[in-house]
């Protein structure tokens, strides 16, 4: 315990700091939290990298999208270091035409500025675009920008209960998004 705090003292100190940044770019920035808490956050993520898993039916979904010549972008608020770790563990990188993090644009996906910069960068066909996310705020932002199909992932982790996000199509796994079911 680097700061000699009890668990409850640490929670009382950390939670208000975290809540103040929720939904902002800093919320997702490893460098920011490393500076604030004087901890090697990237190493802490590395230490739990064995918990990183590919969601059920993601590979089948991506295979079908590729087979139909769809452009596929991973668009995330995660810090570039976090994405590099996840790609190293999952080997998913080759499925994507590009991996874009909100840090590339200096604004989180919750903000309309992100979507405008994304559109400038990859020339979105908004009406034909499909976007998946597990954050209600991000989904609302994508919908407001005009993304044609916005889908809520209601079970983003096997470790948490299903949570329905009102106002959106909800899926628990990508099996529900595969147009032709694998045999």
Regions found by a protein language model. Give the residues of each.
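N-terminal helical cap/lid subdomain that shapes the substrate entry/recognition surface
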Residues: 1-60, 68, 79-81
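A general structural-boundary detector
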Residues: 20, 45-48, 70, 105, ...
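Asp-based, Mg2+/Mn2+-dependent phosphohydrolase catalytic module
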Residues: 63, 79-80, 84-183
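Short, conserved structural micro-motifs that define repeat-unit consensus positions
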Residues: 66-73
